[in-house]
Amino acid sequence: MKEKELIDIWKREESVAHIHGWDFSHIEGKYTEETDLPWNYQNIILDYLKPEMKLLDIDTGGGEFLLSLRHPYVKTSATEAYPPNIQLCKETLLPLGIDFRAGDGKDMLPFDDYEFDIVINRHGDFNTKEIHRVLKCGGIFITEQVGAENDRELVELLLGKTELPFP
């Protein structure tokens, strides 16, 4: 396929893509990773999460993953820093009774000391001192992060040989 044809395809796909939060269902079946992860982040959380526990999701995106956990809304809190997602969370999470607050995961969290049993963070920034501060004694922090080598082949296809973004 010629470069112009590819660009035309990408432009058509971009014009119909409706990205809200972290919902990328519009690319379902069009892109797959070469290897599956050797763990299931959702299952790990659900192994620890009990209905009576207070849960905080830092950098929730649009809240899609958080809602998939089906945790009691009155025991659920979330933060997000990206302005379009903040608005989306206000429209979707607040009406459900979820305690949503705008805030950046790497800064001071807008919650009291020792408030949460479980804090989760999927691919977002976080401040370990703040997580320690808001977790109850014996609380659990569960995170899934992206490494410098993730999708390296795709990065090099698009950008050529580049330095790793971090060690």
What are these regions (language model features)?
Residues 108-118:
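A short acidic, Gly/Pro-enriched loop at the edge of an enzyme's catalytic core
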